Amino acid sequence: MEYLTNLKTNIMDKQLGHREVSEGSTQPKPDPSGATMKACVWDGPLNVKIAEVPKPTITHPKDVIVKTTACTICSGSDSHIFSGEMPGIEKGAILGHESCGIVAEKGDEVNNLEIGDRVVIAFDLACGQCSFCKRHEYAACDTTNDSKLMDVNYGSHHSAIFGYTKLLGDVPGCQAEYIRVPFAEINCCKLPDDIPDSEGLFMSDVLCTSLHACTLGEVKKGDTVAIWGMGPIGLYAGRWAQILGASKVIGIEVVPERIELARQKFGFTVIDRNEVSDVPKKIMELVSNGVDCAIEASGFRFSTSILHKVERAVGLETDSPDMITECLNAVRKYGHVSIIADYVGTSNQFPIGHVVMKHLTIRSGQCPCQNYFGYVIDNIRSGKIDPRWMVTNKIKFDDLPDAYNKLFYKEDGYVKVYCDMTE
């Protein structure tokens, strides 16, 4: 079913053509010398490989080329792409959207960065000049994503995202030796000398996105917060909630190693799905009337009901609503639901009545990382946030294909990898 959806998406993308983008092209020019580089590329469902691809060079005067020093795998969207469940990808696409590195080349119109600067790269690509960017709504940038198909599917388009299918601009990803970064002045954050790569890398997505989850949920001092999914985003959403003053953080998880991590390192109350069948009921036992904020950080692939497992299997829906339904049942009246996980299509039996009858506020969407860089740096420096807590495995670049499998199948305790590209 995923194969047919992906094929249809790619055909429609070609038929519709592409919008003009302000960076000139979402595809970088190859180095005129013919130089190549290593990159991790998609090779069909449940397959990635390391391949030699053309090295990028400056394509637009606002570009920089970053020599990658570290990258990682997103256990959410990268896993969805790896499995073939995220439509709009073709063999050979460079994966990844989380990286940091050193500026190796820069365009003539880049004024706030110099060759040799250490930078972390926002996963969402903004131009800095459109009406959305001027409102600091960078993840909605109107000029970096060339997909007409996204306009057809959703009525408008998202910003481009590195390594994230044709619907998000088909921009080559960050799991590569070199990365072309358009509009570098807004999309690169210079890393201070006291923030090493092992910490700064995770500003590219996890630390900013998890903070954004709390912003969407309007978490404040004294709140009770429940989080579905104890992957990196869920874990750090809980940590940010603690920093913001939450009185209780409840995590919901099924993988034993993640349950242990949430309890021991983060100090959450954890509901183990292996032991509890009715999660909302258990939450109501822990918090009278329900939590102030429910954060969904697990994603569209996860179903608890036979109905939605069958509907997804036969193509009657693309996204299971089971986790969101649990959120709606577990949150208090007038509470907040924050959907930070990936949802891309349609769901059946969505309980819209809960939203109205319980007076709920639901907010969602990708993170505008650029808004959070300064605050995250301050909290890393103070020691309130330690990105190293999530890293379960340190790997080399050639180990990425194996790490994709381990993360997707949740094997050997994999939660988050740190891929050192300096060795």
Curated annotation (Swiss-Prot):
Its cofactor is Zn(2+). Its main location: Golgi. It holds the Pfam family ADH_N. It comes from the Eukaryota. The keyword RNA-binding does not apply. Gene3D superfamilies: Medium-chain alcohol dehydrogenases, catalytic domain, NAD(P)-binding Rossmann-like Domain. Residues 14-36 are annotated as: Disordered. Zn(2+) 1 binds at residues 74, 97. PROSITE patterns: ADH_ZINC. Binds 2 Zn(2+) ions per subunit. GO terms for molecular function: oxidoreductase activity; zinc ion binding. Belongs to the zinc-containing alcohol dehydrogenase family. Class-III subfamily. This is Zinc-type alcohol dehydrogenase-like protein C1198.01. The lineage of its organism: Eukaryota, Fungi, Dikarya, Ascomycota, Taphrinomycotina.
